[in-house]
């Protein structure tokens, strides 16, 4: 009986740890030094993560990265789908130790024979109707919906802890097409986002965009005017449903 109970209890414990990191986090310390020259925000949701970084004293975009993650006890693994600074990481896994100390994430590993330690402070773990990792699977033009199946080339949008980040990339060719992120709210059918970083055009930082949203059969229908002033109607599907990994 004890052996039978061990496996489900371990699974439950690991699931609770994974849920504990869901939300948005800000990098505060790196190798014992306070991070004040850049702003790095990381979002965890549904077994996926993404981060975006910009200069602290300007709106200049620095970098972005993300992919799937797994947690077992304090054994933490990141599997990269995109990384703007280190393309060689795409398609690889990096192992870390992760501890939760006083509500902060302490992530550590060894690099070049020396310890590398990051401390992340929780921004928020709030959830709403759109809290999820999404992948775009459809668009509506002239009352006609066209569908697509995400492959190596895909666009994701991760929302959790009051933060959002979209990323367009190709995990096979390692091509990065763009990203943007910031804060958002989703209430009474209105989705509002405020841009805090944008890789394609720093001048759009600070802009606030309002859209209509509706969740239909588990999919996010997103409509309104884009940041360029063009009408859009997008359909976003839960990432784990919309994107299927190719068989090895």
Predicted feature locations:
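Bacterial Sec-dependent N-terminal signal peptides
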Residues: 1-22
């Amino acid at each position: 009986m004890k052996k039978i109970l061990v496996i489900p209890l371990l699974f439950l414990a690991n699931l609770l740890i994974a849920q504990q990191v869901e939300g948005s986090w800000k990098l505060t310390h790196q190798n014992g030094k306070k991070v004040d020259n850049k702003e790095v925000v990381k979002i965890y949701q549904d077994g996926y993560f993404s981060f975006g970084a910009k200069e602290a004293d300007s709106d200049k975009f620095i970098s972005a990265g993300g992919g799937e993650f797994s947690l077992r006890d304090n054994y933490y693994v990141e599997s990269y789908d995109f990384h703007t600074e280190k393309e060689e990481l795409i398609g690889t896994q990096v192992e870390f130790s992760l501890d939760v100390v006083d509500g902060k994430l302490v992530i550590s590993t060894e690099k070049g024979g020396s310890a590398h330690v990051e401390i992340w402070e929780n921004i928020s773990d709030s959830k709403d109707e759109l809290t999820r990792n999404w992948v775009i699977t459809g668009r509506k033009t002239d009352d006609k919906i066209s569908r697509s199946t995400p492959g190596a080339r895909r666009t994701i949008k991760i929302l959790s802890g009051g933060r959002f980040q979209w990323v367009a990339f190709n995990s096979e060719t390692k091509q990065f097409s763009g990203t943007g992120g910031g804060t958002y709210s989703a209430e009474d059918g209105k989705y509002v986002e405020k841009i805090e970083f944008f890789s394609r055009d720093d001048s759009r930082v600070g802009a606030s965009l309002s859209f209509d949203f509706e969740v239909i059969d588990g999919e996010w229908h997103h409509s309104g005017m884009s940041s360029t002033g063009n009408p859009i109607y997008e359909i976003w599907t839960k990432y784990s449903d919309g994107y299927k990994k190719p068989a090895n």
